[in-house]
Amino acid sequence: MEQTWRWYGPNDPVSLDDICQAGATGIVNALHHIPNGEVWSKEEILKRKAIIEEKGLTWSVVESVPVHEEIKTQTGNFQQWIDNYKQTLRNLAECGIDTVCYNFMPVLDWTRTDLEFEMPDGSKALRFDQIAFAAFELHILKRPGAEADYSEAEQAQALEYFNNMSEAQIQQLTSNIIAGLPGAEEGYTLEEFQAQLDRYAGISKDKLREHMAYFLSQLMPVCEAHGLKLAVHPDDPPRPILGLPRIVSTIEDIDWLTEKVPSKMNGLTMCTGSYGVRGDNDLVKMIKKHGERIYFTHLRSTKREESNPMTFHEAAHLDGDVDMYNVVMAILDEEQRRAEVGDHRLIPMRPDHGHQMLDDLKKKTNPGYSAIGRLKGLAEVRGLEMALKRAFYTK
């Protein structure tokens, strides 16, 4: 696997020099300063590429080129936004970048309720608490119809949870959910947030699938002409939330996506931390079945909690519910399969998220993207990969 690291650009507290010391060789980056929908010019792409290459690193993957909300709803200027997206892809390819991660999650990117969940060892992790989220939906946002998404027991627990919250805790929970996490391009007020949700009224899972298929059908000719691979990131968490449909959550969703848009340029990001939240997602099976479409991997683990099957926290990279040993083995199997047919390029992998620990506990960091936790994760995955290669792949 190609060892990569997500970098949020010149304002990231983790510098490119830090990343070099971590042992990564590839950078995962995006032009976050360009508003959603606008074309990324070659000038801006090359400017960022030069900064990365000056340190001896490679801009391996774009994560992400954001998909404008009007593309997802097929309203307003959606065709113009698609045309802009196509031009951005052309520009990236012509600047030598050929792998683009994106997602098709409505309104929100990845979602957590707690950004400082304390682990037994004192480090801090990200957490999604189903009851806290229910309290937000039912009693803070007061989304119409939200009751249908929760059991009577969950509703009672959510009310108790809400009644015990201080005003500061209400503000913090609201901010955690709607203010935009790292990599998300939008932040909202409560009123703006509900207005965004309302735009999806009447858009079912099947309808959102239609919109995604149309979007990809427009992009594939550009991707095929330039050899540019798209790698869709799964929903996080991988299930419907806030009354919104989710369409990249299961192996059945991947089956549909690859059958509907069969071009090999229509690929996947295997994010084990997102897919792995669901106990019914067999990650190794997913990799073995759709390995040829996997162009990017995010390796991390989550732990489902006993209090509620929908509640989870981000575990250490080799702990939790993800069988990282067999996941990495399956990825290495796919790399070997490719090498046997002449494709020796390694699959880009980044240690996704990491616990805030040690000296980083005293620093301001991007949630999930502190340096030391990811350094630990990268080292662990690197060691696992080396052991597997020595044991099973050395001829």
UniProtKB/Swiss-Prot annotation:
The keyword rRNA-binding does not apply. Pfam families: UxuA. The keyword Manganese applies. The lineage of its organism: Bacteria, Pseudomonadati, Pseudomonadota, Gammaproteobacteria, Vibrionales. GO terms for molecular function: ferrous iron binding; manganese ion binding; mannonate dehydratase activity. Keywords: Iron, Lyase, Manganese. Pathway: Carbohydrate metabolism; pentose and glucuronate interconversion. Catalyzes the dehydration of D-mannonate. Belongs to the mannonate dehydratase family. It comes from Vibrio vulnificus (strain YJ016). Its EC number is 4.2.1.8. NCBIfam families: PRK03906.1, uxuA. Signal peptide: none annotated. Its cofactor is Fe(2+); Mn(2+). It catalyses: D-mannonate = 2-dehydro-3-deoxy-D-gluconate + H2O. One of its GO terms (biological process) is D-glucuronate catabolic process. This is Mannonate dehydratase.
